[in-house]
Amino acid sequence: GDVGYINSNNTKIKVLDCKKINLADKIIFLHKVKVIKGYINADEVFNLEVNTENRKEISSHHTSTHLLHEALREEFGTNVKQKGSLVSNEKLRFDFNLNHPIQSNLLKKIEDVVNQKIYQNDKVNTEIMDQKSAMEKGAIALFGEKYGDKVRVVSMGKSITRKRIAWSVELCGGTHLQTVGEAIRFKIIGESGVASGVRRIEAVTRKSAMLYYEDKNCLLYTSDAADES
């Protein structure tokens, strides 16, 4: 989640993480913090300072998760469903139902589909609507997730069928990029099995993708230097 600082005239608090907690009658946001200076007083006025670069990296991995989900559905069929996911400032992790490993040529194909969408740089659209209307527009809902009467629909990419308002359409309350092009680059760094009939893909975007390629180049240069010696 978000990181940053909570400041007042006499107090400085570092926010290490933020979590959204769904209770029976309300939603709360839990902040994990470290007090660097001063004390936390209930009647004090604080200024909140969000680390926007960290949020951008998380948003990039979240938006790219939606693109990956749709690319998998396109390759293996619409029966592919999300079984779990994690988005951080460093990478994304996506679990989905599939009963066999994915060959390297298909992983490359899926990666290329996501990057093609990123290069098209379409706008990420968000809209609040009733759940029935969302389903009629082709939105994907997560199995087991509880939704209210009004839902937030996140869509991106040009639709290839009249049944959907966009290429990717999902019910989602998370933070996203404004345009998919802000993800810059998508790179799959791992594919594995985590349970019977469940596969996992790990990938990086933006800064993490650039660092990945820099590391690969460093290894290549080191190898070339070793060969020459």
What positions do the PLM features span?
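A glycine- and charged-residue-rich anion-binding loop/surface
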Residues: G1-S223, S229
